[in-house]
């Protein structure tokens, strides 16, 4: 069940993809085709002609809204294209996120973090236990540090005295860097201050799966860092 929930969370619901509601109403829809119009049309399952239609714009704008891209006016620019590329890689991970075998499989239970794809999952040996789920890691200048780590401190209701924000379900694995829930969008730019930001349901699941002393392995490089 955990694996299926994690993978399902990578797909934007059809109702969002088609677009309606207050978030969409907040901004106008552009009639101008962007430089990545065809790529956006293909990604969203629209007719690929490179021309902006009202339906194309609604679909692009809905994707932008769901992934915290601003302005969300339906223009297929480079930020939207890059996000579609990232989400495509996340979806492609499917039930085998460790296909490249970059996260160790000889340590028992371990939380893996792929910075390049902005994905995390928990595995036990070669068995996928939960995920993969989308995460938001450290921005340029505050990169999430790579390598082998261990969970060393957990605080379910942590409050950051440095950034003055709530960090629910915090599980620290490297200095001040931790897995924790955020109230915002995990796809939003530019990234965290080094922590692995998660949706609340995913952070809660990690809390139930991991314990002090459990391994964590971080690898890759976040786009834009």
Which residues are covered by each model-predicted region?
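Short acidic, glycine/serine/threonine-rich helix-capping segments at coil-helix boundaries
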Residues: 26-87
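A structural motif detector for short, solvent-exposed N-terminal "entry" segments of globular domains
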Residues: 98-141
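Exported/periplasmic cell-wall-interacting domains
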Residues: 95-108, 142-148, 153-225
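Extracytoplasmic/secreted envelope proteins and their assembly/folding machinery
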Residues: 37, 41, 57-60, 81, ...
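Low-complexity, Ser/Pro/Thr/Glu/Lys-rich regulatory segments of predominantly eukaryotic nuclear proteins
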Residues: 88-96
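A mature extracytoplasmic/lumenal domain signature
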Residues: 76, 80, 88, 117, ...
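Secretory targeting and sorting signals
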Residues: 1-25
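Sequence contexts marking disulfide-bonded cysteines in secreted/extracellular proteins
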Residues: 28-30, 58, 102-104, 113, ...
């Amino acid at each position: 069940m955990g694996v299926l929930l994690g993978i399902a969370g990578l797909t934007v619901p059809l109702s969002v993809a088609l677009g309606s509601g207050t978030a969409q109403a907040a901004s106008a829809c552009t009639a101008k085709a962007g430089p990545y119009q065809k790529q956006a049309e293909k990604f969203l399952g629209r007719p690929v002609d490179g021309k902006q239609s009202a339906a194309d714009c609604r679909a692009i704008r809905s994707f932008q809204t769901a992934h915290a891209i601003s302005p969300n006016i339906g223009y297929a620019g480079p930020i939207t294209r890059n996000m579609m590329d990232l989400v495509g890689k996340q979806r492609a991970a499917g039930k085998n996120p460790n296909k490249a075998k970059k996260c160790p499989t000889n340590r028992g239970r371990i939380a893996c973090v792929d910075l390049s794809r902005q994905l995390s999952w928990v595995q036990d040996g070669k068995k996928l236990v939960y995920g993969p789920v989308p995460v938001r890691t450290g921005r340029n200048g505050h990169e999430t540090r790579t390598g082998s780590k261990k969970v060393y401190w957990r605080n379910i209701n942590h409050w950051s005295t440095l950034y003055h924000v709530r960090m629910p379900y915090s599980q620290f694995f490297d200095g001040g860097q931790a897995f924790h829930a955020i109230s915002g969008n995990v796809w939003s730019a530019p990234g965290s201050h080094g922590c692995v930001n998660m949706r609340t349901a995913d952070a809660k699941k990690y809390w139930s799966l991991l314990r002090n002393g459990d391994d964590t392995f971080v690898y890759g490089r976040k786009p834009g860092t």
